[in-house]
Amino acid sequence: MNKKALKALLMEVAVVACFAAIACVYFTPALKGWRLTGEDNSANDGLRVEINEYREKNGGETPRWINSIFSGMPTYQIAPSYDSQKTMTAVEKVYHLGLPDYVWYVFASMLGFYILLRAFDFRRWMSVLGAIVWAFSSYFFIIIAAGHLWKAITLAYIPPTIAGVVMCFKGRYLWGFVVTALFATLQINGNHVQMTYYFLIPELLMFGAFVIQCIRKKKVAHLVKATVAIAAAAVIAVGLNASNLYHTYKYAEDTMRGKSELVKEGKQEDQTDSGLERSYITQWSYGISETWSLLIPNIKGGASVPLALNATAMKHADPQINSAGYYNMVGQYWGEQPGTSGPVYVGALVCLLFVLALFVIPNRNPWKWVLIVSTILSILLAWGKNFMGFTDFFIDHVPLYSKFRTVSSILVVAEFTIPLLAMMGLKRFFENMGDAQLRPQMLQKLMLSTVITGGICLFFAVAPTAMGDCVSSMEAQSIRSQLDPQSANMLLSSFSEMRAAMLTSDAWRSLVIILIGAALLYFYYFTAKNNKGKVSWKTSSAIGALIIMVCLGDMWSINKRYMNDSMFKMPAEQTARQKTPVDDYIIQKSGDKRDYRVFNGAVSTFNDNTTSFFFNSIGGYHPAKLRRYQELIETHIVEEYPKALAMFAPERADTAAIQQAGGQMFPAYDLSSVDGDTVCPVLNMLNTRWFIYGDDQRQIPLENTLAYGNAWFVDNIKVVDNANQELDALHQVSPRHNAVIDKQFAQVVGDKCEPADSADYVKLTAQTSTTAEYEAVSKKGGVAVFSEIYYPGWEATIDGQPVEVARANYVLRAIKVPAGKHKVTMTFDPPTVHKTEKVAYVCLALLLLGVALAAFMEWKRKNNKEKTLVADAA
């Protein structure tokens, strides 16, 4: 390696080290092993318990099913781990230098965007600047703080994926294929399909521009080669993730993101042909005026945290209102979203450079229009219900768009395109400094850009309420409905004044940053003018370093509002959840084998996973729960819970059975006089043996002795025609004695059965996450219903012979059992997993072959070059 090449390599190593240092400094607690305490982070802890226990007992194998939340569900979107991914996981660890969690997410984001800009032939310092402003966009830190780590990881790999595509466009087909395939594989492996899907917008527009460019220049051969390389890379990436993608796709059909089989009257206009309801898709829609947060972070108050926590706002607080505690009850955010963890802010100086790019980049440059159109589409779609006609068009006509909720998150595309176009504009500005004719034009365009961006900031700084009071319509309506007009007006006026102060402060802040950035560019201009277009390396480097420092300082300080050291805790503090006296009592009474379920009403039952630390829960939290189970929750479970609590009336207390656990006394009840089939039949068929009543201060365990158990024989079969009838029938018949069967499963268990004998039984004898064994005894044979959730892939055998599994009672499993004593085994080991794994291994081999071939061709090229130089010298 010659000195020039060695120097270049060392510079790249220095850049990588710089990125690592920046990420490490920001996440100092992570270097000590501390973990975030974000809501979704904590929610995942309960999920991991059963999965980790299974892995410990099965040589690290990941279960494809868990029983601990929502009465049981697949793990395709909880722990999407497959053996074929191990090689790429090892590659990923090398790529992020083995840095700790959180640290490497930001490091990988910076490195990925740096690779992209280098593929575009940007100077090193500009590539560093672009990498920092992309990675430090506020949204990325907000999602890390919230525990949306898959999203952060996926986003980190999108820029280098596009870098590979750019390399193909530039004729480096083999390396372009390798880079695209490698990072597309890692991107998809990040397991946030929504982010990958959204970025198809700029990617398809880029490819379209490339096609047009090739056709105009009559470079058809180049177009074909590049297209083949990109397509091959896409096939390899998809194939390597075949197991995850296939099962995610199939699973989505059965989740809340799939189309419901229920026909809901009166909601036709809210339905989509497939996917979520329109109101659910657009529940989190970015406000139109809220879009100014790209330039001014507190345009709508920032995050939904108490107003009392903002020092700037409290300077304008009313002492009388403050003493009443209202400022602790109202949030800083006043936008139209239900709530938010923070704004989408891309940086004030970045916005200046973006506007500058609109003027300095020639209109004939296709990249300019690709990035502008992508930015506009991103913003319009993020508005969601605030621009419903446009959103409806995408929901109705764009494939798969209706599968994703929280449309505001599509702003990540703008967070990508704005910095990229800004860097292109900055590059053009510096390049044109050497041209005496273009130089004055650059100055004029810089001044115009400064006036536009700075003027917007100045407008909001001096007139923060010009576009209305700083109070949301929902907030105003709520307060006016609870207070008399005078009190409501006083409160709303105070809130508006305090929030206006926050907006004013941030508007001035953005203006100052814009003026500093503009001053640096002016200085570069005057240096070039006074030196006939030439600027020394030292001056250029100094200005570049100052621009980097301004951008990093700006975005660092904003991100610290939403992601800071106080949000970390030592692992022992965060994850080591100790058993409560209630937990001890339940385990003492019913054991810890997880062969029963618990309804925990002392927490937000269907938004909390803490119950799953020690028990199989009726509730839980996961954004992609099974759709039928969600419909059962809405139609039956929520309705039955209050009735179930009423069973434990004081007159049924069994004082002789009161027991103690953990130093506390807990009541017991005699439910022999209660008809469980009419009070809470659905909860009973789910084997809900325990209810926990109370709140976070005091919990009371209530034993439900009426639960049906793990399985039972029924007396009758009720065949229905559709999902509506199936769900409604549970209001009319007792699941203890009847199996409600959709007609599509009638051939599996028949349309009638022999009534169960009093001596018939089905007993659970062994169970793991993915298997269950039963002893079934019946005099005449019959239909057995199991208190386990039905899902395609569950297979059953009777004495080793396979039998079909039917769906009963809307969500449960049922099989037909012959007379006599039999061993029933249920197993969840979907054959599709093994088939897709074979596809993944083939694609892995092809990728490794491509890497080896690219390395060989690069070695051959350099070797031939050296031979040529030696020959020329001779």
PLM segments and residue spans:
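Hydrophobic alpha-helical transmembrane segments
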Residues: 99-113, 342-357, 414-423, 510-518
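Membrane-interface coil-to-helix junctions
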Residues: 22-116, 120, 132-155, 269-346, ...
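Extracytoplasmic/lumenal acceptor-recognition loop(s) of multi-pass membrane glycoenzymes
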Residues: 59-81, 299, 304, 309, ...
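Active-site-proximal, structured, solvent-exposed surfaces of multi-pass membrane proteins
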Residues: 352, 689, 731-874
